Amino acid sequence: MNSVDLTTDLQTLLTGENVQMNLSVPHLVEKILERKEGVLTSSGAVRATTGTYTGRSPKDKFIVEEASTKDKIDWGAVNQPISEAAFDRLYAKVLGYLKERDELYVFEGFAGADEKYRLPITVVNEFAWHNLFARQLFIRPEEHDKKPEEQPFTILSAPHFKADPLVDGTRSETFIIVSFEKRTILIGGTEYAGEMKKSIFSIMNFLLPEQNILPMHCSANIGEEGGTALFFGLSGTGKTTLSADPKRKLIGDDEHGWSSTGVFNIEGGCYAKCINLSEEKEPQIYNAIRFGSVLENVVVDSKTGEPDYSDSFYTENTRAAYPIDAIDNIVKPSIAAHPQTIVFLTADAFGVLPPISKLTKEQAMYHFLSGYTSKLAGTERGITTPEATFSTCFGSPFLPLPAHVYAEMLGRKIDEHGVGVFLVNTGWTGGGYGTGERMSLAYTRAMVQAAIEGELDKAEMRTDRIFGLHSPVHVPGVPDQVLDPAKTWTDENEYEEKAIHLAKAFKQNFKKFSNTENIEKAGGPLV
C-alpha cells in the first residue's frame, strides 16, 4: 500500500456518511449519554471507564521502521520496531473496521500553541467520549484559523478492534503504532484515552528537535512581572502542587516546547491525576471538573452522581481531562518568554539528597538525563523499602531519539539564556522512609520561591562531598539545619552509607547512555 492509496482511503473514511465531524461539546456529551458510553456526574462532567487497561501499554507501542527515520530512532524496549508491511496490513484492517461503525467522531485541531510550530492533527474515534477527550486535550481551532497546508498527523482509534499477534506482528491484541512517513497513529485494543495524548507527545519529541525546539515533559508558569519557570518531575514529586501557585499564571501542566523565541504549551488542556482530589488541596483542578470535562475511571455514586475521588476501585490512576481555560489563572495563548528558572523535582525516599541545590550546566544535563525519583515498593510481608527509579529526561517512554540529543539541546539553551537550574528534593529528611519524615511542603514552597525570585543566585553555598551538589547555607523561611541532609540524621555514618548507595545507583543507571562521558565527568556524583 503506497502513501497515495493510504491518503485516498483515509479521505474515503473521513467523508463517509457515518462521520460526525467536529461536534460541539454539548453535542458530544449528548452522544456519550445516548450511547451509554458514560454517565453525567453531579458537577456536569462525564465519567467513563476504560475496562481492562487503566493506564498506558508501553510494551504494545511500536514505531514503523522506515527509510527516512530508521537511522534516527533510538530502537530498544521503549521504541520497538515494526515492519512497514505489518503496519499496512493493520492499517487496512482498522480502516475497514472503522468504516463499518454506525458512527465515527472526528476532531480536527492542533498540537503546539505557537502558530509557527504547531502540528495539524486529525483524531478519528470509535467512541464519542474519546473524541470529547481529544477536543479538550488538544488545541481547538479558532474561527479565523486558516486550513493547514501541511498534511495532518492522523490518529485512528479503534478500542474494540483487537489485533491477532500471530498474523499482525504485535505483542498482544493491543497496539499503538506510529508511522512518521505516513503521518498516522493506529490505536487498538485499549480504551485508555491517555494513549492518544501521549502518542502525540511522542511524535512531537521526534519532530520538534528537527526545528531546534526542545520538547519537554514539564509544567510551566509565569509571574505577574514575567519570569517563566519550568517544573520537571516524575509522579509523586509534587509537580502539580508546586506549579499551581496562585501568584503565578499557568502556561501548561505537562508538555511544552522551548523554541528560539520562548516556551509554548503543546496541548490545549490538562489530564490531571485525581486520586484523593479535594477542593482544599487542589482547588484549581477540583473546580475545573465541570460540564465538558471527562472523568476517567473515577467511582461515581449511582444515586447522587457524586464522584468519590478517594476510591481506587478501578485504579489508582484516576484522571480528569479538561480544557486549560477551565482554570482561571492562565496565560492566553499558552506561550511565554524563555525560562529564567528550571526546577527538577525528586522525591528521594532515601533521605540523602539536599532539599535544594543549584546546578551547574553539566549537573543540569546529568540530572536531566538521570530523571531520578524513588518509589516505595511493597513486599509481601508489608515492609516497604525505597527503590531508586530513573526515567530519562523525566519522560523516558516518550523519547524516540537518543537521550543525549535532548540533553545537549538543554545544555545549549541553559547557556544561551543564562537559566538558573535547581534540584529540589520533596522526599524525606532526617532519615530515609520509615525513620525520617516527608519534607515540609511549606519549606519546599519557600525554597522554590527563593529560587524563582533569584534570591539564591548569590547565596553562600556548601558543596556536598558525595554528589558534588551546591546547596545554599540559608534560605528565608527554612531552618538552616534542614538544608544540610547529613545534619538531620541522628547517625551521620549511616547517612554517608545510604548516600554512597544512591550515588552508585546513579552511576549504574548512567551506563546505559552513549556519548555522555563528559556530562558524567563534570556533572555526576564525586564518589
UniProtKB/Swiss-Prot annotation:
Stored CDD domains: PEPCK_ATP
Protein name: Phosphoenolpyruvate carboxykinase (ATP)
CC cofactor note: Binds 1 Mn(2+) ion per subunit.
A Pfam family recorded for this sequence: PEPCK_ATP
Binding site residues for ATP: K198, H217, G233, L234, S235, G236, T237, G238, K239, T240, T241, E282, R319, T444
A GO cellular component annotation in the UniProt record: cytosol
Keyword Iron-sulfur recorded: no
Function: Involved in the gluconeogenesis. Catalyzes the conversion of oxaloacetate (OAA) to phosphoenolpyruvate (PEP) through direct phosphoryl transfer between the nucleoside triphosphate and OAA.
Family affiliation: Belongs to the phosphoenolpyruvate carboxykinase (ATP) family.
Pathway(s) served: Carbohydrate biosynthesis; gluconeogenesis
Protein localization: Cytoplasm
MF terms in GO: ATP binding; metal ion binding; phosphoenolpyruvate carboxykinase (ATP) activity
Catalytic activity: oxaloacetate + ATP = phosphoenolpyruvate + ADP + CO2
Originating gene: pckA
Signal peptide: none
SUPFAM superfamilies according to UniProt: PEP carboxykinase N-terminal domain, PEP carboxykinase-like
InterPro entries: PEP_carboxykinase_ATP, PEP_carboxykinase_C, PEP_carboxykinase_N
GO BP terms in the entry: gluconeogenesis
Residues that hold substrate according to the record: R56, Y192, K198, R319
Keywords: ATP-binding, Cytoplasm, Decarboxylase, Gluconeogenesis, Lyase, Manganese, Metal-binding, Nucleotide-binding
Positions bound to Mn(2+): K198, H217, D254
Enzyme Commission number, as recorded: 4.1.1.49
Swiss-Prot/TrEMBL cofactor(s): Mn(2+)
